């Protein structure tokens, strides 16, 4: 009640700092930054990853609209990947796509069908379930594709011993 009683309910201040520290500690992350919403968080992460107009970003077919809006805000194009039986991004199909439909050339990942650069992927841990990202993250790291986890629906969920998080 102290936060409400103090009259200091805002996007800044001591309670926001305490919240960020608590989330970082709880998830085992080095840092946590409170954002106004998931769309803003993904938008910022895509900008940091260097996504620009004309680039492509892989996203699941089943998701909240936030990742797709964030991609569109930058003038980039979503490349939709099918969902697995748990409604998450189908990792096997996504890896197959990266290996067979994307050419790695001069440090860029070129979609063979469109000729556009694939810059990032947004796996979404939907309905509290998690995606095993180990192999996908390894492939993306080797190719320089940013992996931006949307863990908005999975706070408190784990992949093995690790919490899901944004900021893979």
Per-segment meaning from a language model:
Residues 1-9:
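N-terminal "arm"/small-domain region of PLP-dependent enzymes with the aminotransferase-like
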Residues 34, 59, 120-123:
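A short beta-strand submotif of the Rossmann-like class I SAM-dependent methyltransferase core
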Residues 55, 61-62, 82, 151, ...:
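Nucleotide-sugar donor-binding loop of glycosyltransferases
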Residues 86-168:
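Active-site phosphate-binding strand-loop segment of PLP-dependent enzymes
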Residues 63-68:
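Conserved coil-to-alpha-helix start sites within the AMP-binding
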Residues 60, 77-86:
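Short beta-strand->loop structural element characteristic of the AMP-binding/adenylate-forming
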Residues 9-56, 70-73, 80, 105-113:
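Phosphate-binding glycine-rich loop
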């Amino acid at each position: 009640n102290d936060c409400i009683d103090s009259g200091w309910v805002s996007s800044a201040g001591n309670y926001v700092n305490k919240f960020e520290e608590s989330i970082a500690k709880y998830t085992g992350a080095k840092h946590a930054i409170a954002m106004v919403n998931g769309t803003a968080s993904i938008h910022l992460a895509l900008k940091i990853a260097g996504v620009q107009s004309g680039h492509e970003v892989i996203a699941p077919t089943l998701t909240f609209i936030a990742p797709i809006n964030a991609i569109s805000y930058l003038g980039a194009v979503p490349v939709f990947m099918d969902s697995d039986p748990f409604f998450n991004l189908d990792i096997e199909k996504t890896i197959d796509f990266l290996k067979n439909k994307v050419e790695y050339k001069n440090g860029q990942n070129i979609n063979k069908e469109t000729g556009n650069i694939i810059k990032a992927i947004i796996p979404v841990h939907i309905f509290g379930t998690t995606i095993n990202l180990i192999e996908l993250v390894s492939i993306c790291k080797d190719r320089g594709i940013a992996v931006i986890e949307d863990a908005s629906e999975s706070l408190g969920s784990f992949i093995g011993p690790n919490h899901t998080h944004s900021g893979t």
